Protein backbone atom coordinates (compact mmCIF):
# COMPACT_ATOMS: atom_id res chain seq x y z
CA UNK A 1 0.00 0.00 0.00
CA UNK A 2 0.88 3.70 -0.02
CA UNK A 3 3.49 4.93 2.42
CA UNK A 4 1.91 6.49 5.50
CA UNK A 5 2.90 8.88 8.28
CA UNK A 6 0.94 8.85 11.55
CA UNK A 7 1.21 11.95 13.75
CA UNK A 8 0.27 12.15 17.42
CA UNK A 9 0.70 15.06 19.86
CA UNK A 10 2.49 13.18 22.64
CA UNK A 11 5.01 10.46 23.28
CA UNK A 12 2.51 8.39 25.32
CA UNK A 13 -0.02 8.35 22.50
CA UNK A 14 2.65 7.50 19.95
CA UNK A 15 3.80 4.45 21.93
CA UNK A 16 0.20 3.30 22.53
CA UNK A 17 -0.72 3.61 18.85
CA UNK A 18 2.50 1.96 17.67
CA UNK A 19 2.13 -0.97 20.08
CA UNK A 20 -1.51 -1.49 19.07
CA UNK A 21 -0.68 -1.69 15.34
CA UNK A 22 2.43 -3.87 15.71
CA UNK A 23 0.47 -6.27 17.97
CA UNK A 24 -1.40 -7.26 14.78
CA UNK A 25 1.92 -8.16 13.11
CA UNK A 26 2.02 -5.04 10.92
CA UNK A 27 5.55 -3.60 10.62
CA UNK A 28 6.10 0.07 11.52
CA UNK A 29 8.82 2.37 12.88
CA UNK A 30 9.03 5.29 15.31
CA UNK A 31 10.49 8.71 14.53
CA UNK A 32 10.52 10.78 17.70
CA UNK A 33 13.33 12.28 19.77
CA UNK A 34 11.30 11.86 22.99
CA UNK A 35 11.05 8.10 22.29
CA UNK A 36 14.78 7.88 21.53
CA UNK A 37 14.13 6.36 18.09
CA UNK A 38 14.45 7.86 14.62
CA UNK A 39 13.67 5.29 11.94
CA UNK A 40 11.98 5.93 8.59
CA UNK A 41 9.89 3.25 6.83
CA UNK A 42 6.66 2.74 4.88
CA UNK A 43 4.66 3.21 8.10
CA UNK A 44 6.04 5.84 10.48
CA UNK A 45 4.68 6.84 13.90
CA UNK A 46 6.00 10.31 14.70
CA UNK A 47 5.70 13.51 16.67
CA UNK A 48 5.62 16.69 14.59
CA UNK A 49 8.55 18.36 16.36
CA UNK A 50 10.92 15.58 15.29
CA UNK A 51 9.60 14.55 11.88
CA UNK A 52 9.36 18.10 10.49
CA UNK A 53 13.18 18.19 10.32
CA UNK A 54 13.27 15.40 7.69
CA UNK A 55 10.39 16.53 5.48
CA UNK A 56 12.72 16.42 2.44
CA UNK A 57 13.46 12.73 3.03
CA UNK A 58 9.76 11.97 3.48
CA UNK A 59 9.03 13.57 0.10
CA UNK A 60 11.80 11.55 -1.57
CA UNK A 61 10.42 8.36 0.01
CA UNK A 62 6.99 9.15 -1.43
CA UNK A 63 4.89 9.46 1.75
CA UNK A 64 1.34 9.76 0.34
CA UNK A 65 -0.92 9.59 3.38
CA UNK A 66 -0.91 11.39 6.72
CA UNK A 67 -3.09 10.20 9.62
CA UNK A 68 -3.43 12.63 12.54
CA UNK A 69 -4.49 11.43 15.98
CA UNK A 70 -6.17 13.93 18.34
CA UNK A 71 -6.60 16.14 15.27
CA UNK A 72 -8.02 18.99 17.36
CA UNK A 73 -4.84 19.32 19.44
CA UNK A 74 -1.85 21.43 18.55
CA UNK A 75 -2.07 21.19 14.75
CA UNK A 76 -2.66 24.87 14.11
CA UNK A 77 -4.23 25.71 10.73
CA UNK A 78 -2.79 29.25 10.98
CA UNK A 79 -0.53 30.25 8.09
CA UNK A 80 3.13 29.87 9.00
CA UNK A 81 2.47 27.50 11.92
CA UNK A 82 4.79 24.52 12.44
CA UNK A 83 2.02 22.19 11.20
CA UNK A 84 1.09 24.19 8.08
CA UNK A 85 4.74 24.73 7.12
CA UNK A 86 5.30 20.97 7.33
CA UNK A 87 2.14 20.02 5.40
CA UNK A 88 2.69 22.63 2.68
CA UNK A 89 6.15 21.22 2.07
CA UNK A 90 5.17 17.52 2.27
CA UNK A 91 2.04 17.90 0.08
CA UNK A 92 0.50 14.49 0.95
CA UNK A 93 -2.28 13.10 -1.22
CA UNK A 94 -4.62 12.19 1.65
CA UNK A 95 -4.89 13.57 5.20
CA UNK A 96 -7.30 12.02 7.71
CA UNK A 97 -7.75 13.29 11.27
CA UNK A 98 -9.17 11.37 14.24
CA UNK A 99 -10.64 12.97 17.37
CA UNK A 100 -13.34 12.50 19.98
CA UNK A 101 -13.68 16.30 20.30
CA UNK A 102 -13.76 17.85 16.80
CA UNK A 103 -13.55 21.42 18.06
CA UNK A 104 -10.93 24.06 18.86
CA UNK A 105 -11.00 26.74 21.51
CA UNK A 106 -10.81 30.19 19.95
CA UNK A 107 -10.49 33.50 21.77
CA UNK A 108 -12.74 36.15 20.21
CA UNK A 109 -13.40 39.82 20.82
CA UNK A 110 -16.12 42.30 19.92
CA UNK A 111 -15.07 45.84 20.76
CA UNK A 112 -13.84 45.81 24.36
CA UNK A 113 -15.40 42.44 25.17
CA UNK A 114 -13.31 39.26 25.02
CA UNK A 115 -14.85 35.81 25.08
CA UNK A 116 -14.06 32.25 24.05
CA UNK A 117 -15.92 29.73 21.99
CA UNK A 118 -15.43 26.16 20.84
CA UNK A 119 -15.35 26.21 17.06
CA UNK A 120 -16.30 23.04 15.20
CA UNK A 121 -13.20 21.83 13.36
CA UNK A 122 -14.72 22.33 9.89
CA UNK A 123 -16.39 25.66 10.85
CA UNK A 124 -13.47 27.92 11.69
CA UNK A 125 -11.16 30.38 9.97
CA UNK A 126 -8.59 29.43 8.92
CA UNK A 127 -9.79 25.87 8.38
CA UNK A 128 -7.68 22.79 7.59
CA UNK A 129 -10.06 19.84 7.84
CA UNK A 130 -12.90 20.53 5.42
CA UNK A 131 -15.12 17.43 5.54
CA UNK A 132 -16.34 14.86 8.04
CA UNK A 133 -16.18 11.38 6.52
CA UNK A 134 -17.29 9.26 9.47
CA UNK A 135 -18.99 9.91 12.80
CA UNK A 136 -19.83 7.41 15.52
CA UNK A 137 -21.97 8.65 18.40
CA UNK A 138 -21.33 7.89 22.07
CA UNK A 139 -24.66 6.04 22.45
CA UNK A 140 -23.75 3.88 19.45
CA UNK A 141 -20.35 2.98 20.98
CA UNK A 142 -22.04 2.05 24.26
CA UNK A 143 -24.56 -0.11 22.37
CA UNK A 144 -21.82 -1.88 20.39
CA UNK A 145 -19.74 -2.50 23.51
CA UNK A 146 -16.81 -0.21 22.63
CA UNK A 147 -17.43 2.19 25.52
CA UNK A 148 -17.70 1.24 29.19
CA UNK A 149 -20.97 2.53 30.70
CA UNK A 150 -20.31 5.31 33.23
CA UNK A 151 -21.92 5.69 36.64
CA UNK A 152 -22.07 9.28 37.88
CA UNK A 153 -21.63 10.55 41.43
CA UNK A 154 -22.10 14.33 41.55
CA UNK A 155 -21.33 16.48 44.58
CA UNK A 156 -22.70 19.88 45.54
CA UNK A 157 -20.05 22.55 45.11
CA UNK A 158 -20.13 26.25 45.96
CA UNK A 159 -18.51 27.99 42.99
CA UNK A 160 -19.01 31.60 44.17
CA UNK A 161 -15.23 32.16 44.33
CA UNK A 162 -14.68 31.10 40.70
CA UNK A 163 -13.56 33.79 38.23
CA UNK A 164 -13.03 33.40 34.49
CA UNK A 165 -9.73 34.41 32.92
CA UNK A 166 -9.54 37.47 30.64
CA UNK A 167 -10.77 35.64 27.53
CA UNK A 168 -13.45 33.63 29.30
CA UNK A 169 -12.03 30.21 28.38
CA UNK A 170 -11.25 28.81 31.85
CA UNK A 171 -11.34 29.70 35.52
CA UNK A 172 -8.17 31.31 36.87
CA UNK A 173 -5.85 28.96 38.78
CA UNK A 174 -6.10 31.25 41.83
CA UNK A 175 -9.90 31.20 41.91
CA UNK A 176 -9.99 27.41 41.41
CA UNK A 177 -7.69 26.89 44.40
CA UNK A 178 -9.72 29.39 46.44
CA UNK A 179 -13.01 27.62 45.63
CA UNK A 180 -11.49 24.21 46.38
CA UNK A 181 -10.19 25.54 49.74
CA UNK A 182 -13.53 27.13 50.70
CA UNK A 183 -15.35 23.85 49.98
CA UNK A 184 -12.77 21.84 51.97
CA UNK A 185 -12.65 19.66 48.87
CA UNK A 186 -9.25 17.98 49.10
CA UNK A 187 -10.06 16.52 52.53
CA UNK A 188 -13.45 15.32 51.26
CA UNK A 189 -11.72 13.61 48.32
CA UNK A 190 -9.35 11.78 50.68
CA UNK A 191 -12.30 10.74 52.83
CA UNK A 192 -14.10 9.35 49.76
CA UNK A 193 -10.94 7.55 48.62
CA UNK A 194 -10.81 5.73 51.98
CA UNK A 195 -14.07 4.02 50.94
CA UNK A 196 -13.53 3.76 47.17
CA UNK A 197 -10.20 1.95 47.61
CA UNK A 198 -12.24 -1.06 48.78
CA UNK A 199 -14.44 -1.25 45.65
CA UNK A 200 -12.37 0.31 42.82
CA UNK A 201 -9.16 -1.30 41.57
CA UNK A 202 -7.64 1.67 39.75
CA UNK A 203 -8.42 5.33 40.48
CA UNK A 204 -7.24 8.44 38.60
CA UNK A 205 -7.70 11.76 40.42
CA UNK A 206 -7.55 15.26 38.88
CA UNK A 207 -6.64 17.87 41.51
CA UNK A 208 -6.46 21.69 41.59
CA UNK A 209 -2.63 21.85 41.70
CA UNK A 210 0.50 19.70 41.68
CA UNK A 211 1.01 20.73 45.31
CA UNK A 212 -2.41 19.29 46.23
CA UNK A 213 -1.51 16.07 44.36
CA UNK A 214 1.71 15.67 46.35
CA UNK A 215 -0.02 16.38 49.68
CA UNK A 216 -2.83 13.89 48.98
CA UNK A 217 -0.52 11.10 47.78
CA UNK A 218 1.79 11.59 50.77
CA UNK A 219 -1.18 11.39 53.17
CA UNK A 220 -2.46 8.14 51.59
CA UNK A 221 0.99 6.54 51.64
CA UNK A 222 1.49 7.54 55.30
CA UNK A 223 -1.97 6.67 56.61
CA UNK A 224 -3.27 3.79 54.47
CA UNK A 225 -0.28 1.90 53.12
CA UNK A 226 3.03 2.81 51.54
CA UNK A 227 2.90 2.75 47.73
CA UNK A 228 -0.90 2.90 47.39
CA UNK A 229 -0.71 6.35 45.72
CA UNK A 230 1.57 8.27 43.38
CA UNK A 231 1.73 11.54 41.42
CA UNK A 232 2.41 12.33 37.75
CA UNK A 233 2.90 15.93 36.59
CA UNK A 234 4.49 17.82 33.70
CA UNK A 235 7.86 17.94 35.45
CA UNK A 236 8.06 14.23 36.34
CA UNK A 237 11.27 12.84 34.74
CA UNK A 238 10.57 10.54 31.78
CA UNK A 239 11.87 7.27 33.30
CA UNK A 240 10.15 7.94 36.63
CA UNK A 241 6.87 8.73 34.86
CA UNK A 242 7.09 5.49 32.85
CA UNK A 243 7.68 3.49 36.02
CA UNK A 244 4.72 5.14 37.82
CA UNK A 245 2.38 4.55 34.86
CA UNK A 246 3.54 0.93 34.55
CA UNK A 247 2.92 0.29 38.28
CA UNK A 248 -0.51 1.92 37.96
CA UNK A 249 -1.50 -0.21 34.98
CA UNK A 250 -0.26 -3.44 36.58
CA UNK A 251 -2.14 -2.74 39.83
CA UNK A 252 0.89 -2.08 42.04
CA UNK A 253 -0.30 1.50 42.59
CA UNK A 254 -4.03 1.91 43.16
CA UNK A 255 -4.42 5.71 43.05
CA UNK A 256 -2.63 8.25 40.84
CA UNK A 257 -3.07 11.98 41.39
CA UNK A 258 -2.42 14.46 38.57
CA UNK A 259 -3.24 18.01 37.56
CA UNK A 260 -3.62 17.35 33.82
CA UNK A 261 -0.62 15.20 32.76
CA UNK A 262 -2.79 12.12 32.18
CA UNK A 263 -5.80 14.04 30.89
CA UNK A 264 -5.53 13.28 27.16
CA UNK A 265 -4.89 9.97 25.42
CA UNK A 266 -3.86 8.05 28.55
CA UNK A 267 -4.82 4.45 27.75
CA UNK A 268 -5.46 2.28 30.81
CA UNK A 269 -8.40 -0.09 30.18
CA UNK A 270 -8.32 -1.29 33.80
CA UNK A 271 -9.16 2.21 35.10
CA UNK A 272 -12.52 1.91 36.85
CA UNK A 273 -12.79 5.27 38.63
CA UNK A 274 -12.06 8.89 37.69
CA UNK A 275 -12.35 11.60 40.34
CA UNK A 276 -12.64 15.14 38.97
CA UNK A 277 -11.43 17.18 41.92
CA UNK A 278 -11.42 20.62 40.37
CA UNK A 279 -13.93 22.86 38.61
CA UNK A 280 -13.40 23.58 34.91
CA UNK A 281 -15.07 25.80 32.33
CA UNK A 282 -13.50 23.77 29.50
CA UNK A 283 -15.83 21.19 27.97
CA UNK A 284 -12.93 19.57 26.09
CA UNK A 285 -10.94 19.07 29.30
CA UNK A 286 -13.92 17.63 31.16
CA UNK A 287 -14.80 15.28 28.29
CA UNK A 288 -11.19 14.09 27.92
CA UNK A 289 -10.85 13.44 31.68
CA UNK A 290 -14.00 11.34 31.77
CA UNK A 291 -12.88 9.62 28.58
CA UNK A 292 -10.01 8.01 30.51
CA UNK A 293 -12.54 5.69 32.19
CA UNK A 294 -14.45 4.42 29.16
CA UNK A 295 -11.84 2.02 27.73
CA UNK A 296 -13.22 -1.52 27.67
CA UNK A 297 -11.71 -4.50 29.48
CA UNK A 298 -12.92 -8.02 30.22
CA UNK A 299 -14.57 -8.12 33.62
CA UNK A 300 -15.12 -4.35 33.75
CA UNK A 301 -18.83 -3.73 33.35
CA UNK A 302 -18.90 -0.06 34.38
CA UNK A 303 -16.70 2.78 35.62
CA UNK A 304 -17.42 5.38 38.28
CA UNK A 305 -17.05 9.12 37.67
CA UNK A 306 -16.97 11.23 40.83
CA UNK A 307 -17.67 14.83 39.78
CA UNK A 308 -16.70 16.64 42.99
CA UNK A 309 -17.33 20.13 41.59
CA UNK A 310 -20.65 19.58 39.82
CA UNK A 311 -19.06 20.29 36.42
CA UNK A 312 -21.80 18.27 34.75
CA UNK A 313 -24.33 20.95 35.72
CA UNK A 314 -22.41 23.23 33.33
CA UNK A 315 -21.89 20.78 30.48
CA UNK A 316 -24.62 18.20 30.81
CA UNK A 317 -24.19 14.43 30.63
CA UNK A 318 -21.40 13.46 28.21
CA UNK A 319 -23.27 10.24 27.46
CA UNK A 320 -25.71 12.52 25.57
CA UNK A 321 -22.97 14.05 23.39
CA UNK A 322 -23.72 13.95 19.67
CA UNK A 323 -22.01 15.29 16.56
CA UNK A 324 -24.70 16.17 14.04
CA UNK A 325 -25.18 17.74 10.65
CA UNK A 326 -28.28 19.56 11.86
CA UNK A 327 -30.89 20.47 9.27
CA UNK A 328 -30.66 24.12 8.24
CA UNK A 329 -27.60 24.72 10.45
CA UNK A 330 -24.81 22.30 9.49
CA UNK A 331 -22.27 20.49 11.63
CA UNK A 332 -22.21 21.04 15.38
CA UNK A 333 -21.62 19.32 18.70
CA UNK A 334 -24.63 18.92 20.98
CA UNK A 335 -25.23 17.68 24.52
CA UNK A 336 -28.79 16.47 24.34
CA UNK A 337 -30.69 19.44 22.90
CA UNK A 338 -27.98 22.02 23.62
CA UNK A 339 -25.51 23.34 21.03
CA UNK A 340 -21.96 23.71 22.41
CA UNK A 341 -19.92 24.76 19.34
CA UNK A 342 -19.59 28.08 17.49
CA UNK A 343 -21.36 30.05 20.20
CA UNK A 344 -19.79 32.06 23.06
CA UNK A 345 -19.01 29.73 25.98
CA UNK A 346 -21.73 30.00 28.60
CA UNK A 347 -24.44 31.02 26.09
CA UNK A 348 -27.43 28.73 25.73
CA UNK A 349 -28.65 27.77 22.26
CA UNK A 350 -30.95 24.78 21.76
CA UNK A 351 -32.08 22.88 18.67
CA UNK A 352 -35.43 24.70 19.01
CA UNK A 353 -33.56 28.03 18.68
CA UNK A 354 -31.83 26.72 15.54
CA UNK A 355 -35.19 25.65 14.08
CA UNK A 356 -36.56 29.18 14.58
CA UNK A 357 -33.57 30.68 12.76
What are these regions (language model features)?
Residues 44-86, 258-260:
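Conserved RecA-like ASCE ATPase "motif II neighborhood" in helicase/translocase motors
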Residues 49-52, 72-74, 234-328:
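Conserved RecA-like P-loop NTPase helicase motor core
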Residues 22-57:
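Inter-Walker segment of RecA-like/P-loop motor cores
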Residues 2-23, 210-211:
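Conserved Walker A/P-loop ATP-binding site and its immediately adjacent core
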Residues 130-204:
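Conserved interdomain linker/interface between the two RecA-like ATPase lobes of SF2 helicase motors
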Residues 138-148, 297-356:
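A conserved SF2-helicase RecA2
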Residues 15, 30-40, 214-215, 226-260:
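Conserved helicase ATPase core of P-loop NTP-dependent helicases/translocases
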Amino acid sequence: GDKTLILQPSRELLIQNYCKLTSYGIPATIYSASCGKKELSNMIYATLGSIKKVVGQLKEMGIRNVLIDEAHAGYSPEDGSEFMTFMNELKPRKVIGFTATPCRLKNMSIGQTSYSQLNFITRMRPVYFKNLIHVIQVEEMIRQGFWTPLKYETWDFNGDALKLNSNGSEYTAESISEAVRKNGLNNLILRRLMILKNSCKSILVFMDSVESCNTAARWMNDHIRSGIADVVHGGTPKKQREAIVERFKSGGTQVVFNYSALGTGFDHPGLDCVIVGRPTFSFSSFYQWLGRAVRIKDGKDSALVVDCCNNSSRFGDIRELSIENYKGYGWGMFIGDKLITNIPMGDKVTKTDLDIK
